[in-house]
């Protein structure tokens, strides 16, 4: 509990320091906040997402997963974009037999979403998700190649942005895992580029026992968009979740801190200045 309080305190201090250093948030920054909440936005971006699970394993240690997840969009003409997302996990995993932890890399995920170039009321993306066998040890991932479908659905109505990222990955090998993932999100954008966010990640291990299948967290937090040096947009957010349903070995709480660096194109900057995102 002490570590959790320290983590939240550091995040709040960081938010306050950045907030006080910014003066006057333009309409374009509000539009940038909405853009950062769209997984299939045609924009280069570089998020760092840090997830901490508390009281994990028999010794009650913390598990930490830092996801480095660059997003690289490509135009396929006037009608469609291809949104490429890579997730590189760096995992600090507590031991199940000793009161120690170790750090390594997990299996890399690559997703390619085909998405319309022009946004409608319902924004969507669809494509494959691949799991690459890059885990540096069995404690960090299955180390098996996997593949499955992935879908993004969302809508933007006034100050609201809501939707979900859904995928299911089956791996091929001795373990042959079969796992489901849904990251649903609801954002409400506030004045001065602040926003409220709830974006829990719900997972299911289809091969686990019935009472061990699901991890269902519930919670949310706050975020803010600033411009570093007046030029580079950065979205920051902090969230806290309570695990309503969980398998054995996981604690009740988890936190997430995220930094989301954005690099909009010239045409996108013009759209944001006109409030067309």
Predicted regions and their residues:
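Bacterial N-terminal signal peptides that target proteins for export
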Residues: 1-12
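N-terminal signal peptide c-region/cleavage motif recognized by signal peptidases
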Residues: 21-23
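Transmembrane beta-barrel domains of Gram-negative outer membranes and organellar outer membranes
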Residues: 26-172, 176-277
């Amino acid at each position: 509990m002490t570590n959790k309080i320290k983590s939240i305190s550091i995040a709040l201090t960081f938010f306050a320091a950045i907030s006080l250093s910014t003066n006057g948030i333009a309409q374009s920054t509000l539009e940038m906040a909405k853009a950062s909440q769209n997984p299939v936005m045609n924009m280069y971006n570089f998020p760092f997402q840090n997830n901490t699970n508390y009281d994990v394993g028999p010794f009650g240690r913390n598990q930490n997963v830092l996801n480095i997840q660059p997003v690289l969009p490509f135009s396929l003409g006037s009608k469609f974009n291809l949104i490429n997302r890579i997730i590189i996990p760096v995992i600090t995993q507590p031991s199940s037999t000793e009161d120690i932890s170790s750090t390594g890399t997990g299996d890399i995920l690559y997703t390619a979403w085909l998405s319309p170039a022009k946004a409608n009321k319902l924004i969507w993306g669809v494509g494959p998700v691949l799991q690459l066998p890059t885990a540096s040890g069995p404690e960090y991932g299955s180390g098996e190649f996997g593949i499955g479908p992935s879908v993004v659905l969302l809508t933007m109505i006034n100050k609201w942005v809501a939707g979900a990222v859904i995928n299911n990955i089956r791996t091929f090998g001795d373990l042959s895992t079969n796992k489901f993932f849904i990251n649903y999100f609801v954002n409400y954008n506030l004045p001065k580029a602040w926003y409220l966010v709830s974006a829990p990640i719900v997972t299911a291990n289809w091969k686990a026992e019935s009472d061990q299948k699901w991890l269902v967290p519930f919670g949310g937090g706050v975020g803010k968009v600033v411009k570093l040096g007046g030029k580079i947009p950065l979205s920051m957010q902090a969230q806290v979740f309570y695990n309503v349903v969980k398998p054995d070995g996981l604690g009740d709480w988890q936190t997430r801190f995220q930094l989301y660096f954005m690099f909009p194109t010239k045409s996108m900057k013009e759209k944001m200045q006109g409030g067309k995102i």
